[in-house]
């Protein structure tokens, strides 16, 4: 997390600049556009603190539909080197989602997490998020607007400032009278 140059961020009413970074990081999971991996085994990457049993790890990988692939491609199952799997970008994102499932936090940040995946992988990710992260706060940074329609609230930024806040469906119903409606129309492909 970066230090703020202005303003403040409150989580549950607490100014995070007054809290130890370790405490903040332990309560936030993030999945970025590129995902984060270390050299080592599948297990090292999904459970870096080595606190989960094999069944829990396999369950998380099954939920994101990667367990079979890891069993097929990995020479030693969870002990296989992560690099020998040659995961696609979408599979890497699903793996990161399995890691978040295995290590739940109060807040899940998705920073362009679906921007480099195909439509099928995006659908899997959205389904897993809907079914498994309902009790968490989810903050999604996205240009693929379809991925945020299930959210309770969207915040539209313009030039680094909040331009609009609201329910995505209510904002879309107002059409181009809203920033979100205009953005939606602008980003939709032309009809043939």
Segment roles from a protein language model:
Residues 10, 67-95, 106, 117, ...:
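ABC-fold ATPase nucleotide-binding domain signature/coupling loops
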Residues 130-140, 148:
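Conserved catalytic loops of ABC-family nucleotide-binding domains
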């Amino acid at each position: 997390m970066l230090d703020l140059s202005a303003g403040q961020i409150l989580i549950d009413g607490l100014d995070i600049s007054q809290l130890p970074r370790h405490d903040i990081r332990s309560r936030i999971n993030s999945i970025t556009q590129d995902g984060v991996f270390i050299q080592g085994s599948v297990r090292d990457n999904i459970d870096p603190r080595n606190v989960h049993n094999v069944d829990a790890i396999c369950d998380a990988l099954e939920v994101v539909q990667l367990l079979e692939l890891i069993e097929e491609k990995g020479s030693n199952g969870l002990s296989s080197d992560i690099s020998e799997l040659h995961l696609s970008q979408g599979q890497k994102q699903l793996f990161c989602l399995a890691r978040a499932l295995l290590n739940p936090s109060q807040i899940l940040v998705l920073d362009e997490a679906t921007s480099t995946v195909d439509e099928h992988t995006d659908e899997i990710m959205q389904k897993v998020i809907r079914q498994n992260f309902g009790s968490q706060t989810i903050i999604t940074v996205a240009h693929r607007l379809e991925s945020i329609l299930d959210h309770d609230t969207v915040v539209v930024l313009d030039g680094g400032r909040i331009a609009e806040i609201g329910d995505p469906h209510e904002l879309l119903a107002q059409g181009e009278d809203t920033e979100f409606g205009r953005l939606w129309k602008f980003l939709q492909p032309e009809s043939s």
